[in-house]
C-alpha cells in the first residue's frame, strides 16, 4: 500500500507561486543584459543568431494579413462549386432529356397507330364496297332527283328547261350541246364499216391521249434555234420602225423547205418517249385481249396445237379426216396405258 501524499496548505501554495514568478522575471532580464554586452563585443555572432532565429521561427503576421488568406480561401471555395453537386445536376438533366425523348417516341407511336388504323378501316370499307355498284347508285340518284325536280316544276305550271337554264351560262350551254351532239354521232359510228374509218378512229384516239401540244417547249426550242443561227451568221435580226423584230434568212437554210432535213434532228424528251412506250404496251394488251376473246368464241380456248394460222388450218383438215382413226390412240396416251 503506497504512502499517502502530503497535502500543501494554502500559505505554502501562495509562497510557491510567488517564487516561480520571481524566477521567471530574473530569467527574462538576464538574457537582455547579456545580449547588450555581447552585441558590443561580437556583432557577427548576434547577426548569425538573428538570421538563424528568423529562418527557424515562423513570421509573425498582422490581423489584416492573416485575414486575407482566409477571405481568399472563402472566395475560392464559393466560386468553385463542389464536383458532387455538378455531377448530380448533369445526371438530372440527362434523365430529363431521356424522359422527354421517351414521351416524344410514345406520342409518335400512338399517332402512327391511329393513322394506320384509319387507313386500314378505309381500305377494308373500299374492298367491301363495289365501285360499279356505287357508280350505278349515284347515276340512279341523279336520274331520280332530275325527274322529281321536273315533276315539281311542271306541277307548278313552269317551264323545266327554262328553269334549268338559269343555272348555266350561254357558253356552258353551247359546250354541253356540242358534247351531246358529238356523243350521239359517236354512238352511231361505233359499228365497223371499213379499215380506213377504223384507222381514223384510232388516230383520233391517239391524238386525244397525247394531251395536246407542248407550246412552252416549242417556244424554248424556237428561241434557242434563232439564237444559234444568229450567232452563226446565217440569220439576221432586223427591227422595223414599228418595233417589230424580223428574222431574215441569208442563205435559205434556217426556214424549212421541201428539201430540208431538220425534222430528222429532233430529239424528244424522256416524258414523250415514256408516253409512246405506254401507248404501245396498251395497244398490245388490247390486241391480246381481243385475241383471247376471239379464241374463246371460236372454241379454241383449249390446248394450242398450232404455231400460226396456216398450221391451225392444216391441223383442222387432218382432224376432219383422221380423228375417227386416232381417237383411241390419243385416249390411250392420255390414260397412260399405251405400250
Swiss-Prot record:
Associated with the spliceosome. The keyword Ligase does not apply. This is Pre-mRNA-splicing factor syf2. Involved in pre-mRNA splicing. The gene is msp-4. Belongs to the SYF2 family. It comes from Neurospora crassa (strain ATCC 24698 / 74-OR23-1A / CBS 708.71 / DSM 1257 / FGSC 987). The lineage of its organism: Eukaryota, Fungi, Dikarya, Ascomycota, Pezizomycotina. GO terms for cellular component: catalytic step 2 spliceosome; post-mRNA release spliceosomal complex; Prp19 complex. Its main location: nucleus. One of its GO terms (biological process) is RNA splicing. Residues 17-37, 126-135 have a biased composition (Polar residues). Residues 45-93 have a biased composition (Low complexity). InterPro entries: mRNA_splic_SYF2. Keywords: mRNA processing, mRNA splicing, Nucleus, Spliceosome. It is found in: Nucleus. The keyword Zinc-finger does not apply. Residues 7-16, 94-103 have a biased composition (Basic and acidic residues). Transmembrane segments: none annotated. Pfam families: SYF2. Residues 1-136 are annotated as: Disordered.
Amino acid at each position: 500500500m503506497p504512502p499517502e501524499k502530503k497535502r500543501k496548505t494554502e500559505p505554502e501554495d501562495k509562497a510557491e507561486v510567488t517564487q516561480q514568478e520571481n524566477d521567471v522575471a530574473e530569467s527574462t532580464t538576464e538574457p537582455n543584459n547579456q545580449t547588450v554586452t555581447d552585441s558590443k563585443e561580437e556583432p557577427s555572432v548576434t547577426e548569425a543568431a538573428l538570421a538563424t532565429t528568423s529562418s527557424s521561427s515562423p513570421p509573425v503576421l498582422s490581423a489584416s494579413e492573416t485575414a486575407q488568406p482566409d477571405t481568399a480561401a472563402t472566395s475560392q471555395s464559393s466560386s468553385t462549386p463542389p464536383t458532387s453537386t455538378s455531377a448530380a445536376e448533369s445526371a438530372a438533366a440527362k434523365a430529363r432529356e431521356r424522359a422527354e425523348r421517351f414521351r416524344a417516341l410514345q406520342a409518335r407511336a400512338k399517332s402512327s397507330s391511329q393513322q394506320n388504323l384509319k387507313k386500314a378501316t378505309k381500305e377494308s370499307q373500299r374492298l367491301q364496297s363495289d365501285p360499279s355498284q356505287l357508280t350505278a347508285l349515284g347515276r340512279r340518284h341523279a336520274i331520280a332527283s332530275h325527274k322529281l325536280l321536273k315533276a315539281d316544276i311542271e306541277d307548278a305550271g313552269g317551264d323545266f328547261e327554262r328553269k334549268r337554264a338559269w343555272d348555266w351560262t350561254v357558253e356552258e350551254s353551247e359546250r354541253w350541246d356540242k358534247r351531246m351532239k358529238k356523243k350521239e354521232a359517236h354512238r352511231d359510228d361505233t359499228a365497223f364499216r371499213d379499215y380506213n374509218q377504223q384507222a381514223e378512229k384510232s388516230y383520233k384516239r391517239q391524238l386525244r391521249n397525247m394531251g395536246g401540244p407542248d407550246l412552252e417547249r416549242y417556244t424554248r426550242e424556237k428561241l434557242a434555234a434563232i439564237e444559234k443561227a444568229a450567232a452563226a451568221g446565217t440569220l439576221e435580226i432586223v427591227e422595223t420602225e414599228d418595233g417589230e423584230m424580223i428574222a431574215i434568212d441569208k442563205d435559205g437554210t434556217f426556214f424549212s423547205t421541201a428539201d430540208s432535213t431538220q425534222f430528222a434532228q429532233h430529239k424528244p424528251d424522256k416524258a414523250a418517249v415514256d408516253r409512246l412506250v405506254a401507248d404501245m404496251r396498251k395497244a398490245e394488251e388490247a390486241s391480246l385481249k381481243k385475241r383471247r376473246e376471239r379464241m374463246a368464241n371460236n372454241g379454241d380456248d383449249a390446248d394450242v396445237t398450232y404455231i400460226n394460222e396456216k398450221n391451225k388450218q392444216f391441223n383442222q383438215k387432218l382432224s376432219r379426216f383422221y380423228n375417227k382413226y386416232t381417237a383411241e390412240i390419243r385416249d390411250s396416251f392420255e390414260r397412260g396405258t399405251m405400250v
